[in-house]
Structures are given as C-alpha cells and as structure tokens.
Amino acid sequence: MKDELESIDAAGAVLLWRASEYYPERRAQIDDTPACITARGNLHLLTQPMIAIVGARNASINAQRHVHNIASELGKHGYIIVSGMACGIDAEAHCRALDTGTIGVIAGGIDIVCRPENADLFEEVASRGLLLAEMPPATKPTPKHFSIRNRVIASLAVGVVVAEAAHRSGSLITAREAATRGSDVMAVPGSLLDPRSDGCKQLIHHGATLLQNEADVIECVSRQPAVRIPPEQFEWTDSMRQTIDQTAVGRCAKN
C-alpha cells in the first residue's frame, strides 16, 4: 500500500476514500463500488452535476458535430462532461468541455496513457479538468478494465448520452449500467444506413430518450423530478445482454 501511495503522489494524484469530502456522492450510494478511487486534477468538479457523453471511436462527422453542440450547451448549463478518454466521441466531448469542466475516466492506472494519440488530451484534462482511475498506478488496461471504466462513468453521471454506437460498442455497457442505476439514458439516432448508429437505435427502441438536438438533452435532464428509465422498463433481451457483455472480452478494448 505504501508503494501504491508513493506512485499516486509521484503522478500528482490523490487517493479518494469513500468517506472523503470529494468522493462522488452518487458513487458512494452504490454498495459494490470500491472504497477508493484515484484522482488527478480539479476535485471540485466531483461536487457538480455530471452528464456522460460516450460513443464510437471511428465517429462520423455528424456525430462529432452533435457532440460539439451537446457538450457546449451542457457546459453552459453547469453540467460537467464525463467520458472515457478514448478517440472519437470521447475525445470530442472532452475537448469541447475543457473550458466548462470535464472528467476523464481512465481504464488503466492514473499514470498510464492508454492511447498515444491522446497523450496531449490526457495532460489537458489533468491540468484543466479531472482524471479518475479505479485501477492502481502502473496498471496497463486489459479488455476487462474498459468494461470497468464504463461502469465507473455510469456511476458518476445523472444521465448518459450515447452519441454514436455500433451493435457491439462498449458504450452500450455504459448505457446498461446507467439504466440499472435509474439514470437518464439518451441516444442520437444517426443515419439509418450507418452501422455505427445501430447500437443507438437499439437503445431508443428499448426506451432511451431520442435526441434530435442539444435542447433535447437539457429538457431531459432538467425535468423536476427527473424522469428516469427504471431498470424493469429498460427491456434488454438476452441477445442484447450477450452481445454487450462480449465487448468486455472482445472489441471493448478498442473503445
């Protein structure tokens, strides 16, 4: 434990215990979450309402444009943007929220840059936002760690926006976990001809809120009381569960 704490300190990070002032409140209410999480950056962001934006690595231009607008609008309304530090949708969401607040959840250790092409973004989020990691320092991510990362994202946010996701996207894990926790699940429908949107269409078919523009997101998360999708109404079929869970041992590592 001493070595781990020294590594955390060397990375410019801190260890947040469940009893800590800054330990995320929504996460603290979940019984099976670990007692601590590593953080590097502006801890105050953890006290603000958060919305997750997730989606495809190989995102379409239209999806990136939607994310640009959604992240910007949510920032203006005081929401912190949470995403997974991957390429594509994640990177776009983080970039557009640097000025208003963004949290990047890492699949590996707090000192591990998963994708070299995101090294600059990694440091930008650390200095202007916040990085979180559930794994110990020096942990290089494996496929199962990406599944864990997606669950962490879902545990932080009051709502999840899936901007673009294929049939077997790891983003569907985030959506499933959010629905299980009673959070808003929202999805951009995308083109009927683009397989990168097939996962979003599934989510909408099974009860997620259809998003046509950024105003729809604000309306959805601003309802008093907030309208959530109860897990029992989020009708996952056995085939959907099997497909989504397979990402943890397959393509999830690419997300």
Please state what every model-predicted region is.
Residues 1-3:
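Helix-hairpin-helix
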Residues 6-255:
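Glycine-biased, small-residue-rich flexible motifs in mid-sequence functional cores and linkers
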